[in-house]
Amino acid sequence: MFKIPGFGKAAANHTPPDMTNMDTRTRHLKVSNCPNNSYALANVAAVSPNDFPNNIYIIIDNLFVFTTRHSNDIPPGTIGFNGNQRTWGGWSLNQDVQAKAFDLFKYSGKQSYLGSIDIDISFRARGKAVSTVFDQDELAKQFVRCYESQIFSPTQYLIMEFQGHFFDLKIRNVQAIDLGDIEPTSAVATGIETKGILTKQTQINFFKGRDGLVNLKSSNSLRPRSNAVIRPDFKFEDLGVGGLDKEFTKIFRRAFASRIFPPSVIEKLGISHVKGLLLYGPPGTGKTLIARKIGTMLNAKEPKIVNGPEILSKYVGSSEENIRNLFKDAEAEYRAKGEESSLHIIIFDELDSVFKQRGSRGDGTGVGDNVVNQLLAKMDGVDQLNNILVIGMTNRKDLIDSALLRPGRFEVQVEIHLPDEKGRLQIFDIQTKKMRENNMMSDDVNLAELAALTKNFSGAEIEGLVKSASSFAINKTVNIGKGATKLNTKDIAKLKVTREDFLNALNDVTPAFGISEEDLKTCVEGGMMLYSERVNSILKNGARYVRQVRESDKSRLVSLLIHGPAGSGKTALAAEIALKSGFPFIRLISPNELSGMSESAKIAYIDNTFRDAYKSPLNILVIDSLETLVDWVPIGPRFSNNILQMLKVALKRKPPQDRRLLIMTTTSAYSVLQQMDILSCFDNEIAVPNMTNLDELNNVMIESNFLDDAGRVKVINELSRSCPNFNVGIKKTLTNIETARHDEDPVNELVELMTQSA
């Protein structure tokens, strides 16, 4: 609420008509015309001295209130109204009406004065319209001079003379207040039942009326806009959207703050309002929900919501026409009312599906380009509109035509990211509100614990988790047997969602931007074997790089190259480091997933994975077998230069300011990468050698629970004679051990297999 200048003073500074000891009996009167123009311009009811006292309030048909003025030209039993008054009441001449004295203070209590009044103004005769610009402050002074102390209600019609011109006025809305209050406590009302007395302190706002012909000069006062875009009773917590406090603050600052300021201030600043707001981010983070909720917090026209593909049509020119139709209402109102017109909101969902970069389509029709051109023309063309707000939503901001992202178009771009722990707690609080209010949630459920356990869950996934937990609780009351399914009615009364239900739901619902746990665990299927001090050293180095990415302010991106012979355990070590990191987002890019894809599909897959890695605060990417990803083969040799160049760029591209990324890349062809000139893309290198001494083999046999001590000693002794230059990878060693385990003579079988491998 805004403070209204002049209020907060004693109510004694205004004396209303004395209504004490007034005869309140109802009288039946006939409607007649007012005696002359002075009565018509004064907005009074002409009455006979025999019917009512002079200068009191009367109410007609228990709804319409006027101030009386005596006239000897009005016979007893009649009441004189001008044409505007008769239009407001819906009366015809000689019609019977009921009239009685009216005490506003008994009707409304202390809130009987007008804090503000909004008035539509039109020329009484269109043929006498002039292009003169009328000062709103002077109009307001004239209105007070003519009608001070009269009672006004929304929908009321009256006629006013100003500078020799006659105007029809219609009361749009009023705000009733108590003169003793510092600030208004009631909302702006548009219903006729709200009534108030006009005073010198009343804030009066004029707007172009139905003809749109009256040119109004912006008021020089610093009073706020009467048609403020933000509802006065709006609170952010009422939106029911959690985890987006910073985003809502930015949206309000950039898109709405200017719209609640007085037009005179905005005019002095020489700025225009923001017309476009782009919400982008991962799926399920609440972009569409925010757009819908923004419509509820605004005093605006009902938003027009359009899914991107709905714009397109098979008929020539229809797609462009669909765009024009979305702006038609806003254009018509802006022509009629100018800066005083209401805000029109247009919401585009899946913006990237239609407004792609011009020239990128291969259909040859040019329809997509024309649709982009049409939207650009409407948002920021020659005939600019200042009463629109276009809200676009997309998961792929990079696909949208760059011209749409410049100032004047979608200039406010807000990333709706995955919620942090505080945001997830807010979302859990919202999603379980009814559950808690109805005592359907067990006391052992700790929402803070659940928020900590649900790293990288989007708002939609948290909602799914709550539903899954509820299904586990419901399932306890249902007996599903061979016969009919039975519901235990006794258990329904005791139904509660417990901590165990939520923990079970965590296994049921996994985040889209979480850990590729299944793929990574496949890489270390047999567990991590610490057969050598070198393995311990590699894991410690990896943990150090993890800490660097997590804690250092200067290392948003760290790239590691893990190289060594094939089968030396590079992928397993990278997977182990990733799994032990505790990072919420871990992805594996493996040749297995890209097998069978075309070159362009591989590039798109790798690019999308890197982009996904920028959507979480802490991220790890494991790129397995880099030389295979670029399709390198020694015969020729040949490789995909497009994939190679894409990887070179991606490996060096730093994530956004508040995101961290650790990239671990494995290769068995170090010399090949050297020739490809990609080694400079990595910050550090970790060498993973084969097993080169028999003590390491002995440790592997012990951890694999293979043979007894005597058998292992025999294997080592045999290999020391047959393989003086022992050099075998851990992967091959484990395979040989499993093969020998199923032989009748495992000792000799393993010795033979290891000799062949060495």
Curated annotation (Swiss-Prot):
Main location class: cytoplasm
InterPro entries: AAA+_ATPase (IPR003593), AAA_lid_3 (IPR041569), Asp_de-COase-like_dom_sf (IPR009010), ATPase_AAA_core (IPR003959), ATPase_AAA_CS (IPR003960), Cdc48_dom2 (IPR004201), CDC48_domain_2-like_sf (IPR029067), CDC4_N-term_subdom (IPR003338)
Positions contributing to ATP binding: 281-288, 564-571
Phosphoserine modifications at: 226
Molecular function GO labels: ATP binding; ATP hydrolysis activity; phosphatidic acid binding; SNARE binding
Keyword terms: ATP-binding, Cytoplasm, ER-Golgi transport, Nucleotide-binding, Phosphoprotein, Protein transport, Repeat, Transport
Cellular compartments annotated: Cytoplasm
Gene Ontology BP, a term: vacuole fusion, non-autophagic
Source domain of life: Eukaryota
Gene Ontology CC: cytosol; Golgi apparatus; Golgi stack; mating projection tip
SMART domains for the chain: AAA, CDC48_2, CDC48_N
Protein family membership: Belongs to the AAA ATPase family.
Protein role: Required for vesicle-mediated transport. Catalyzes the fusion of transport vesicles within the Golgi cisternae. Is also required for transport from the endoplasmic reticulum to the Golgi stack. Seems to function as a fusion protein required for the delivery of cargo proteins to all compartments of the Golgi stack independent of vesicle origin.
Quaternary structure and interacting proteins, as annotated: Homohexamer. Binds to SEC17.
Further information: Present with 5920 molecules/cell in log phase SD medium.
Protein name in the entry: Vesicular-fusion protein SEC18
Organism: Saccharomyces cerevisiae (strain ATCC 204508 / S288c) (Baker's yeast)
UniProt lineage: Eukaryota, Fungi, Dikarya, Ascomycota, Saccharomycotina
